[in-house]
Structures are given as C-alpha cells and as structure tokens.
UniProtKB/Swiss-Prot annotation:
Positions annotated to bind ATP: 109-115
Gene Ontology MF term list: ATP binding; UDP-N-acetylmuramoylalanine-D-glutamate ligase activity
Function recorded in the entry: Cell wall formation. Catalyzes the addition of glutamate to the nucleotide precursor UDP-N-acetylmuramoyl-L-alanine (UMA).
Protein name: UDP-N-acetylmuramoylalanine--D-glutamate ligase
Keywords, ordered alphabetically: ATP-binding, Cell cycle, Cell division, Cell shape, Cell wall biogenesis/degradation, Cytoplasm, Ligase, Nucleotide-binding, Peptidoglycan synthesis
SUPFAM superfamilies attached to this UniProt entry: MurCD N-terminal domain, MurD-like peptide ligases, catalytic domain, MurD-like peptide ligases, peptide-binding domain
Length: 419
C-alpha cells in the first residue's frame, strides 16, 4: 500500500483506525466526512474535505468506505464509475500480512453475533489459547489485529456489502441467522442476505462455513444442540439457557473445533463462567410481583420474537424507536400468544399503532420514560414489563446501550428490585 493514494469516507472510530493503518503503511490518505471537527480530530489525513466536495480527487488507487456509509452515497457511486476498488476496514485487514499471523474466525448474522463472539473468545481462553474479539463488536479490527492470538471477528452486513475482492483468510465462519434487518440501508432482504453470504469469499475453505436455522449451503451447527441439550437437561448445575442462547453457544463450539479439538466438558465449564453481555433479554429483577427485562439490543422483528418466546406470557412489551424498514405486522402471531398490552414509543409509534392496534390493546408514549410509566400503570402481579423495541435507538439515544441503561435507571428509580 506504500505510495498509494487512498480516500477514506467517514471519520468516525472506524475511519480513524483506517487512516492510522494506511498512514503506517505509507499511503497518502484523503479524509472525507460530513463533520469538519471529526476530520480535524484525526492527524493521519493528509488532506481533508467535507462530503459536499464537488470535484472528486484525481489519481486515486483505493476507496475505503466506512461501514455506516451507504453504497448509494454519491462519492461511492463515483468511485465505482471510475473503477476504483472499494473496500471496508475488514477487507483491508484481511489483505494485510499482519492479520495472517494467527488463525481467524468470522461471525455474522442478524442477531446473536456479539454473544457468540464473546463466548467463543471466552471458550478459547479457558483452554489456554490467546484469543481476541474485534470488528463490529466495537474494537476496530485494524487496531486489534496487533494482538498476538486468534482473531474472532464480528462482521456486519455493512462490512460485507459489495465484497469486490476475495480474501480467503478465515479458518472458519458462521452465518447465525438471516432475518429482516437494515432494510433502510440494503433496500431489500435479498441484498441484505447477499451481503451476509459474502463471508464465504473470506473463507480458506467453504467446508468451514457453519450456518443456523434454514440456511444453506454450509454445515449446521445446530447438529450440536442435541448432544449439548441432553447434558444441559440432565439436572445440570448450569443456569437455564434460552433456546436462542443455546444456538449461539453451539455455533461457538462448532467454530472452536475449527481451531482445535474442544472436549464437551471444556465447553460446559466455559458456559459456567461466561457472563452474557447486557441488554440482551437481561433480567433486571422484580418489584410488587412485576418482573422487568431489558432487551434493548432487539432492533429487529426476529429479535423481538425470540424475546417473546423466551418470556412466554403476561408480557407488557415496549416497542418503538426509529424503524429500520421492518414490517410490524409480522409480529402479530407471537404477540397474540404472549402479550397482554403493547406500549408503542418514539418516532415510529404511530406506525406501530397502525400496524398492531387491531390485534391487542395498545398505548402510545412519546419517549422511553413515558413508556415505562405507562407500562407500570398497566402491570399487575405476575406480569413482565419487557423492553424489546424492535427498532433502532437513534430517535432518542446514541446507541442501544444508552437506551438500555436508561431503562435500567428508570426501573432503578423505584425501590430496590428483588433479584
């Protein structure tokens, strides 16, 4: 990459990690972003332009698109028209010799990626192996690949979109599931699905692809569930696991076996000491007979459905936020089985009301605080108040984590919960 002229579109956390990496490889880096402050906060750009730039920089060798930048962006379209290779940070990492020093695993899917990545790292470390989580999990891959150990990479559909360069580096990979998600970005489920399946272009061998649910081609890691379930269901000392969690852990088990032979006993021991990340069907406690569950990570209809299946009945569910192109009517079958009342909040509350008001009692709330207050006024002993929004958080919050923390604080404003 030495002496190459490279455009980096996006100067957020990922874009800055890309700029630093390219600078270290001797590239001439041109940064483009909608924020001048973001551009100026990165010292690795040789030139800086706002994304309203009218003249496309000349003689460019490479174009790096930050994951959040849509392929329809005018500068991306122009780069494609000029025949300039377009990559993401993940593709850059996969092409770099430093990444190849250790085995690597890639994990993608609509839901469960972070839990699976973190458990796989935990499992490998419990067996004495160095392993590191990186990628879409919040740790830029171009920074984390400096670590000495197995690379476990969470990869989003954004990072796999328009995978123009095949980089067969992964020792194993999993597509956990595919359901409607980010349709505001990908425009169709087919485009979204194709982006996820691009992970196969990164595999050393397609025989090392593991898939869940009805997906094909690939080996099904769900084959492990029978063996593992038989152990878990025999009075195991392990805490109860939701069905979707079992699926995620089985995926990690299958992928770990692509690296090394992992005894079932080692897997079960790792389960005993693993702490699931927050905001994922997280039980907060009970007060006055009402239970509270934080599932702020649920930003798709499929994730909401999994939460409702896990909780089962007497649910007051808080839905809403910023819709990502999902169809709320797809929830009607599971809602009518498990939910007694819907509280629709935020930017798309009217849209939710139009889609669901005929199926169940529904109340609208302007924001999360009002939604929690309304849910509490409706709840009776034995009920569950479940925050499982099925939407992005950006109408009220900077992230799903901030939304979940706010829910926890609102719940914590009451007397101490009994956990």
């Amino acid at each position: 990459m030495k002496h190459q002229r490279v455009i980096v579109l996006g100067a957020g956390v990922t874009g800055k990690s890309v700029a630093e990496f390219l600078h270290s490889r001797g590239s001439y880096v041109i940064g483009i972003d909608g924020s001048l402050d973001a551009l100026n906060s990165c010292s690795f750009f040789h030139e800086r332009y706002l994304d309203t730039i009218e003249e496309f920089p000349e003689d460019m060798d490479l174009f790096v698109r930050s994951p959040g930048v849509k392929p329809s962006h005018s500068l991306v379209v122009e780069a494609k028209r000029r025949g300039i290779p377009i990559v993401t940070d993940v593709q850059l990492a996969f092409q770099d010799p430093e990444f190849h020093r250790y085995p690597s695993i890639g994990i993608t899917g609509s839901a469960g990626k972070t839990t699976t990545v973190l458990f796989l790292v935990h499992l490998l470390r419990s067996m004495g192996m160095g392993a590191f989580a990186m990628g879409n999990i919040g740790v830029p891959i171009l920074q984390a690949m400096r670590e000495k150990g197995i690379r476990v990479v969470e990869i989003s559909s954004f990072q796999l979109t328009e995978q123009e360069i095949e980089t067969p580096v992964l020792s194993g990979a999993a597509i956990l599931n595919i359901s409607e998600n980010h349709l505001d970005y990908h425009q169709s489920l087919q485009n979204y699905s194709e982006a996820k399946r691009n992970i196969t272009k990164c595999l050393q061998s397609v025989e090392s692809l593991w898939v869940g649910e009805w997906l094909s081609p690939g080996k099904s890691y769900l084959d492990y569930t029978k063996e593992i379930a038989s152990v878990l269901d025999k009075g195991s000392a392990l805490k109860p696991l939701y069905l979707h969690d079992r699926s995620n852990y089985c995926a990690a088990y299958a992928l770990a076996n692509e690296i090394s032979n992992v005894p079932l006993e080692a897997f079960l021991q790792a389960l005993q000491t693993f702490e699931k990340p927050p905001h994922r069907i997280e039980y907060l406690g009970e007060k006055d007979g009402v239970s509270y569950i934080n599932d702020s990570k649920a930003t798709t209809m499929s994730s909401v459905e999994k939460a409702l299946i896990a909780v089962k009945e007497n649910v007051i569910v808080i839905l809403g936020g910023r819709n990502k192109g999902s169809d709320f009517t797809s929830l009607i079958p599971i809602l009518t089985q498990t939910v007694k009342h819907i509280v629709a909040m935020g930017e798309c509350r009217n849209e939710i009301a139009q889609a669901l008001s005929g199926s169940l009692p529904l109340t609208q709330a302007r924001d999360l605080q009002e939604a929690v207050s309304m849910a509490q006024s409706i709840a009776q002993p034995g009920d569950v108040i479940l925050l499982s929004p099925g939407c992005a958080s950006f109408d009220q919050f900077r992230s799903f984590e901030e939304r979940g923390d706010c829910f926890r604080q609102l719940v914590g404003d009451m007397e101490a919960l009994r956990v």
